[in-house]
């Protein structure tokens, strides 16, 4: 019995000593080997996910959350197809429950109600590879789970009588501004590493009476182990969706025509590899919305698992 106890204690002590004294990376590499082999064998399928933290949520130049946000995401890629989901969750109640896109003449009852901004973005893409870059054709669904759906009630002449509101149920796929989902068709071109230019064309095709159009172009420079990105984007024609609108003197027309550079920015970003599959990204952005005459500087960090 004593011999057995001695053997048990000795074996346990030796085992614990090996665990403590052996470098962590040796165990990490051994653990990752099966995963690495699996990824190599199924190289056509990739799964990426992570979470970001930002001092502000800017989307195409628009300050939507008006607060720091958590931004989880997930991406699944199979051959040329890609499915991705993004969430945006404000850390405190800063956004009006009434949609930002409609400015009421008497907003007292609605702007008094504040919520933490939330948004769910779902993308389906198809990538077309070329020698000079990649074309990506996609459809995007924008859903705001906690904001009222605001829409216009018009008379027979087309004049607006009043604004109405309803709860944004996920199964509400109505159009004409009355649904809980806005669908966008987009086409993006991304150049090669030697010429990292990108061009974006996007148009709302469902649940946006204005069928808002957005154009964007940008370029990436390498600077001292950082990426320097410069871009500019804006709307073609007035659009409530991009908060670029003003009332017309004609009662049958709610929007005047016009164009606006709503998203001009410069960003510094850098990726730090903690492990081959674990990446930490840092970004500092300076963005100007010339229509709102607003300048915003934000800092964000994203933890990526790939």
List each model region and its residues.
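Short glycine/proline- and aromatic-enriched beta-strand/turn motifs that initiate or cap beta-hairpins
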Residues: 27-92, 97
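Outer membrane beta-barrel transmembrane domains
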Residues: 227-287, 297-300
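Cleavable N-terminal export/targeting peptides
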Residues: 1-46
């Amino acid at each position: 019995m004593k011999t057995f106890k001695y053997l048990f204690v000795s074996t346990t002590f030796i085992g614990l000593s090996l665990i403590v004294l052996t470098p962590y990376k040796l165990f990490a590499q051994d653990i990752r080997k099966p995963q690495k082999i699996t990824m190599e064998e199924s190289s056509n399928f990739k799964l990426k996910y992570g979470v970001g933290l930002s001092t502000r949520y800017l989307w195409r130049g628009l300050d939507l959350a008006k607060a720091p946000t958590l931004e989880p995401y997930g991406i699944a890629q199979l051959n040329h197809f890609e499915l991705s989901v993004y969430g945006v969750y404000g850390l405190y109640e800063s956004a009006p429950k009434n949609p930002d896109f409609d400015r009421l003449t008497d907003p007292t009852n609605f702007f008094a109600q504040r919520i933490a901004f939330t948004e769910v973005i779902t993308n389906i893409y198809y990538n077309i590879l070329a020698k000079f870059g990649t074309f990506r054709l996609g459809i995007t669904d924008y859903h705001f789970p906690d904001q009222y759906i605001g829409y216009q009630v018009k008379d027979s002449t087309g004049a607006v009588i009043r604004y109405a509101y309803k709860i944004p149920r996920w199964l509400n796929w109505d159009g004409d501004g009355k649904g809980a989902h806005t669908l966008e068709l987009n086409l993006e071109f991304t150049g090669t590493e030697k010429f990292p230019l990108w061009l974006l064309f996007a148009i709302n095709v469902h649940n946006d009476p204005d069928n808002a159009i957005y154009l964007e172009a940008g370029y990436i420079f390498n600077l001292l182990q950082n990426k320097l990105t410069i871009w500019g984007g804006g709307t073609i024609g007035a659009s409530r969706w991009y908060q670029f609108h003003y009332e017309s003197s004609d009662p049958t027309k709610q929007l005047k025509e016009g164009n606006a550079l709503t998203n001009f920015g410069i960003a510094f970003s850098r990726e730090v590899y903690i492990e081959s599959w674990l990446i930490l990204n840092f970004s500092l952005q300076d963005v100007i919305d010339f229509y709102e005459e607003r300048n915003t500087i934000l800092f964000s960090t994203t933890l990526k698992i790939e």
